[in-house]
Amino acid sequence: MGGNKRAYYAVARGRNTGIYSTWDEASDQVKGYGGNRYKKFDSYEAAQEFCRTEGSRYSSSSGPYRRSTTSYGYSPYSSSSSNYSARHSDKYRKKISRSYSTEKDIEIFSNDTHEKSIACSDRQVVYADGSSLRNGKKGAVAGCGVFFGNDDPRNISVPLAGEEQTNNRAELQAIILALENTSGDLTIRSDSNYSIKSLTTWLPKWKKNDFKTSNSQPVKNLDLINRASDLMSDRNVSLEYVKGHSTDYGNQQADMLARRGASE
């Protein structure tokens, strides 16, 4: 039992600060980054303290901040209002922050690009994925996967409930499961552009258009979209796009969990 002791890799200064479960993940954030600060710990609490003390010694705005994903950052807004609260200059899109890079970064526990002052350990990152076997065909079966980390008991692998066994519904439900099984600041990484855009770019427009698409058709999967939106309404949540079926370890694990759920 002693040989499987869990390690925590704290990155107090790097491309994306946070606490990582493997060295491969952490090293991507510090290799080639001038003035990096990182250390391995046997406990989450010690890694957390390192991030707080070492991270506070440096300006959060110094040095490059690069990531390969597209990040959609949420700040809390009132669920009773049809309008999203603002973060940037536009009425709606200031709730959405995007950052791009050609450099590949993988699974992270990071601060949102607009909230780097938050202690790195206060935000967790999970991967969510959905899978539908025979998607769009008769007899399709779908599953949802949420990956928290290697051997993490919180990892989720379940079949998709309901009659509609589509990939899009599985992707949305996976995000819902990630939200329902966490608390506090959260980053969800997904390879579903549909899910991310539904909850960010498109939802404000749909609300103004009586939940109709640009072609005046009813919005599909609105039950899941509204559920996810409600769960995000009182939390600081970021949705980050990662390329599916690539070398991203976290996405691979979430996909495996989703496929397993579809096979149950």
UniProtKB/Swiss-Prot annotation:
Top enzyme class: hydrolase
GO cellular component, one term: nucleus
EC number(s) given by UniProt: 3.1.26.4
Entry keywords, A to Z: Endonuclease, Hydrolase, Magnesium, Metal-binding, Nuclease, Phosphoprotein
Ranges of compositional bias, category Low complexity: 56-85
Residues the entry annotates as binding Mg(2+) 1: 129, 171, 191
Binding site for Mg(2+) 2: 129, 255
Pfam families in UniProt: Cauli_VI, RNase_H
GO biological process: DNA replication, removal of RNA primer; mitotic DNA replication maintenance of fidelity; RNA catabolic process
Phosphoserine carried by residues: 97
Function: Endonuclease that specifically degrades the RNA of RNA-DNA hybrids.
Entry GO MF terms: magnesium ion binding; nucleic acid binding; RNA-DNA hybrid ribonuclease activity
Source species of the chain: Schizosaccharomyces pombe (strain 972 / ATCC 24843) (Fission yeast)
Recorded family membership: Belongs to the RNase H family.
Catalytic activity as recorded in UniProt: Endonucleolytic cleavage to 5'-phosphomonoester
Descriptive protein name: Ribonuclease H
Gene name linked to the record: rnh1
